[in-house]
A protein has these predicted regions:
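Short functional micro-motifs and their immediate structural scaffolds
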Residues: 43, 68
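Short metal-coordination and nucleic-acid-contact micro-motifs, chiefly zinc-binding Cys/His arrays
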Residues: 56
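Thiol/selenol-based redox catalytic cores and closely related redox-interacting motifs
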Residues: 108-159, 165-172
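Cys/His-coordinated zinc-binding microdomains
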Residues: 64
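N-terminal secretory signal peptides
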Residues: 1-34
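Mid-length scaffold segments of soluble, non-membrane domains
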Residues: 84-126
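Bacterial signal peptide processing site
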Residues: 39-41
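Short cysteine-rich clusters marking metal-coordination/redox-active sites
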Residues: 60
Length: 192
């Protein structure tokens, strides 16, 4: 049996990436609660947790896609004991990873791009704390893998986006595993 692949890059479809996400053993969302306990002594550690800008060679940790080649918000996570961030070419992949029950590594910092400031078609910079961001789930704008979750620093920007492209405005803790299921369903266009 052959596996369906994305025609442009040859990567596995979202259906197969769910397995990759589980195998990646990337941090549990509960690990994010430790972010608020930083002290002055942890200042040098906090400096190393700042977001890293992507370049033409930055690839997604789940599927190897080059982040700079695709539209929509990107994400990065700093896991405990990790020198470099894990990058995601899509916010749906980020949330699917963080919300997966199999995840065991603690996420020390999570960043998404502020699409109220970044260019949707070629986002650069504008990294914000994912826990304080405002999201639009169910909108019509596509990211690297089809419909994605818009991320914004300001609620007004998220509401404007939802008014123009549809979707529901939610906070980080309101996004559920069912909203980011990589195995298929209404969220995904399997005809890609």
């Amino acid at each position: 049996m052959t596996h369906p692949y994305h025609p442009q890059c040859g990567c596995a479809t979202r259906r197969h990436m769910l397995g990759w996400a589980a195998l990646a053993s990337i941090g549990a969302i509960t690990g994010l609660t430790g972010l608020t306990g930083c002290s002055q002594a942890d200042n040098s550690s906090a400096q190393s947790l700042k977001p890293v800008e992507i370049d033409g060679a930055t690839s997604c940790d789940l599927d190897g896609m080059l982040l700079a080649d695709y539209p929509g918000p990107k994400a990065q996570v700093r896991f405990a004991g990790q020198d470099k961030p894990s990058f995601f070419c899509d916010t749906v992949e980020l949330f699917a990873t963080l919300l997966a029950g199999e995840q065991v590594r603690a996420a020390q910092a999570v960043y998404v791009q502020d699409m109220g400031q970044a260019d949707w078609n070629a986002p650069k910079g504008h990294w914000i704390d994912a826990k304080t961001a405002v999201y639009v789930v169910g909108g019509k704008r596509h990211g690297s893998m089809g419909p994605t979750i818009g991320s914004f620093a300001q609620e007004a920007d998220a509401k404007k986006f939802a008014g123009e492209y549809g979707g529901k405005v939610l906070r980080f803790t309101e996004i559920t595993p069912a909203m980011v299921d990589l195995s298929g369903g209404a969220l995904h266009d399997t005809r890609m």
